[in-house]
């Protein structure tokens, strides 16, 4: 499923190519690209839920009035999916104002819905980018995240 999300994001959304509204046409194109129907439907449902998150003011996605000094306590299931490196990266993104409490919760929600036994920091970065792309008013945060995703480290790290 994550491969399909990446394919869609890279080929349609991120490249600013007009995405087809017709789900059947899009499904057929994905089948021609080698993806299976079950995984395609899961990926499209994942994207629909992502779009729905920004259209609701139901908590926890919009955490208005929450102090930024509070730490997020992760459930056992979230800890199993998001390792220490991923959780640390989410905290870093909040500290540099790429994410706020509501977008962080959107990211966690979308991560938990990914049907994959393995999830790594690179996958998390793409989910963050997809979430920020879909939230109006987060263009600056999206650009910052894009820089973080595509920047190459300079020199050797010690």
From Swiss-Prot:
Signal peptide: none annotated. InterPro entries: Smg. Coiled coil: none annotated. Belongs to the Smg family. This is Protein Smg homolog. It comes from Alteromonas mediterranea (strain DSM 17117 / CIP 110805 / LMG 28347 / Deep ecotype). The gene is smg.
């Amino acid at each position: 499923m994550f491969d399909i999300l990446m394919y869609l994001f890279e080929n349609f959304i991120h490249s600013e190519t007009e995405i087809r509204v017709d789900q059947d046409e899009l499904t057929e194109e994905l089948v021609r690209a080698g993806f299976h129907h079950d995984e395609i439907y899961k990926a499209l449902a994942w994207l629909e839920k992502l779009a729905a998150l920004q259209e609701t003011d139901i908590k926890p996605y919009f955490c208005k009035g929450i102090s930024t000094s509070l730490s997020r306590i992760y459930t056992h299931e979230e800890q199993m999916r998001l390792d220490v490196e991923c959780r640390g990266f989410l905290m870093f993104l909040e500290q540099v104002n790429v994410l706020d409490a509501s977008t962080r919760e959107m990211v966690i929600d979308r991560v938990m819905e990914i049907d994959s036994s393995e999830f790594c920091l690179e996958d998390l970065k793409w989910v963050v980018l997809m979430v920020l792309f879909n939230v109006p008013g987060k263009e600056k945060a999206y650009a910052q995240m894009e820089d973080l995703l595509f920047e190459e480290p300079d020199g050797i790290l010690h």
